C-alpha cells in the first residue's frame, strides 16, 4: 500500500481556540487564542507492506519559512501546529492535525480499500514544518489541502468525587458498523470489562475502572507478548482500525500502522477521563512524537519506567452531558504518537462521561512545551467505529467532523474550548455549551455553539474553570 507525506509550512496568527501542541499560548481575558494558516505542500510517496514496513523509503523534504521558530514533524499522521496570543497566563497547547490533505486522504482510502486498516493514518503520513509568526488571520490552502491548525487551551489538577454516571446503556455496544475508511467490519463491545489484569481481549470502550478510581495493578515489563493486547486497568482496545487493539503503531523505519512488532512503539487508548503514561523521554529530533509500549525481544516493555501503571486519571474538571436521544462519538487524538483520532469518549443519548482534562504541569512536553488534549466531535448518530478514524474530504467524520473540543489544566485552572474545524464549516446536528456543573463550581466566561455559530465569534470560545467542574452539554 502507498501513503503520501506532506511537508507543510504554516505561519501562525489570527484568533482561535483549540488543542494543539508545540507552541506556547497566552490566555487573554476573552479566552481567545491566535492562529493563522498559510500552507505550502511538497508531496512524496512511501510504500509499505501490510505490516507497515517501508518498502521504498522516502527522503523527507522540509519546507521552510522566514520566521524564528521552525518545527519539523515527519512521517506520521498529518500534523500542524500554530498559536499565539497576548495575556497574563501562559499556556501551551497540545498538537494535533485538524485537517487532512484531500489527496492524501483519498489516496490512502483507495490504497487501503482491501485492507483492514481502519485508520487511514495507518496508511498515510505527513511531515509538517510549522513556523510561528504574529500577524492577522491568514488562511490559504493550495492543492485543496486543508491540513490546518487549531489551538486549544490547557489545564489544572483538581480532583473530587465524580457524581456523573458512566452510561445509562453501558452494557450496550455502540453500533457495529463498517468504517468508511476501512473495508473491514468490526464491533466495539461495550459490556463490562472482564479482567482488570487481562493481557488480551478488547473489553469495553468505557473501561474497567470506576471514574477516578484506581488503577491498582502495576504493569509488569517483559511478561506480555507483543501480539497480545494488555487491556484492563483502564486500558481499552481499539478494535475498529485493524491494529490488534492498539491505537497506533510506530515502526523502526518511521512508518506507522500494522501489528505491534519488534522495535515498534505500540500506543494504546485509556478509558474516558484517563490518559496513557507511556512515551520515551528521548523523542525523535525530527519533530515526530513517539508514544506507547516498546516491543522488545518479543515482549512489551514500558517506555516510561517512572509510571507503574499504563493509564492515569486527568483533572476531574469536565464531563460531557448528553440531552440527546442518539449517541455522540468524541474522538481524542493519540498524542504523543501517531495522532490518530481514535481514542473514544462515546456518550450514549441521555448519559454522561468524564472528558479527559490533561494536567499540563505533569504530562508530556514537546521540546519543553506543555501539551493538552484535543477532540474531534462527530454528529449525533455516528458510531464510534465510523467516527473515531481518519476521515476523507466531505465525509464529515473523524478529522473532518464539524467541531473540536480542547481541554487542559495548568496552575490550578482548567481551560475548556469549543473550536471550529477548518476542514468542515458545516454545523453539527446539535448544539453544545460549556456551563458550571453546579452552584459550587466557578466557570469564567461564556462558551456556546448553537446552530453552527460560536458565542465567541467565528474562531470559537474558551472558558476557565477555577473550582469545581464544568459540563459540555449536548442539546437540540
UniProtKB/Swiss-Prot annotation:
Knockout consequences: Leads to increased resistance to zymolyase treatment.
Localization per Swiss-Prot or TrEMBL: Secreted, Cell wall
GO cellular component labels: cell surface; endoplasmic reticulum; extracellular region; fungal-type cell wall
Keywords attached to this entry: Carbohydrate metabolism, Cell wall, Cell wall biogenesis/degradation, Glycoprotein, Glycosidase, Hydrolase, Polysaccharide degradation, Secreted, Signal
Molecular functions (GO terms): hydrolase activity, acting on glycosyl bonds
Top enzyme category: hydrolase
Region (Disordered): 111-214
Domain of life: Eukaryota
EC numbers on record: 3.2.1.-
Chief subcellular location: secreted
Induction: Expression is repressed by anoxia. Expression is decreased during transition to slow growing or stationary phases.
Keyword Zinc recorded: no
Low complexity: compositionally biased ranges: 111-203
GO biological process, one term: polysaccharide catabolic process
Cited InterPro entries: Beta-Glucosidase_SUN (IPR051526), SUN (IPR005556)
Signal sequence annotation: 1-19
Glycosylation sites: 423
Family assignment from sequence similarity: Belongs to the SUN family.
Note: Present with 1800 molecules/cell in log phase SD medium.
Protein function: Involved in the remodeling of the cell wall during the various phases of yeast culture development and under various environmental conditions. Required for the maintenance of the CLB5 kinase activity.
Protein name, as recorded: Probable secreted beta-glucosidase SIM1
